[in-house]
């Protein structure tokens, strides 16, 4: 599994997509959420070999190292960081206003965590007009959590979630745009159809939102 997560083919695909969707502003200030420590560290190395300036931060990273990385990501200096790869940290309680691209490489296990990670890029800043969120969906069984998180619907109504996938941008307030490619849309529909919304974990997630 590790070899697949860090394969040259996967790295090329990730880079292709982050370049395709781009960012707002003069410089990239990106956060990339990974699923495991070894993946986080290896992907950072592979990005660096391709000319990006990145660092991997995990729960083992010191507070000083984290702060220096954040300061560098926020900077526009020539040698400042383009991306921070992270796992197990930055879900909440961290403020990096210049973040203009958030990349999800980890499975969506919880609507709450998904929103927390997405929120790292939602701080207002004069250097950007919007934030780009790119989610490389991997956990097919839990894909229904994506419309749950983005819509704010906590009743887990399947018809409402299907409608949001179909008409997300029309149902989202403000100038936000939500776009699913055809494969992603199909997998989310399949996940909604197969989901058992009486599971204990979903009930716990809903309770935490109260």
Where are these regions (language model features)?
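Conserved interdomain linker/interface between the two RecA-like ATPase lobes of SF2 helicase motors
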Residues: 1-31
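Amphipathic alpha-helical transducer elements in NTP-driven molecular machines
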Residues: 8-12, 67, 83, 87, ...
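Long, largely alpha-helical accessory region at the distal end of helicase-like NTP-driven motors
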Residues: 24, 146-210
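Conserved helicase ATPase core of P-loop NTP-dependent helicases/translocases
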Residues: 31, 40-44, 48-90
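Short glycine-/polar-rich loops that comprise or flank the Walker A/P-loop
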Residues: 50-53, 97-101, 109, 126-132
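SF2 helicase motor core recognition
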Residues: 84-102, 118-123
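Conserved segment of the helicase C-terminal RecA-like domain
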Residues: 110-116, 120-154
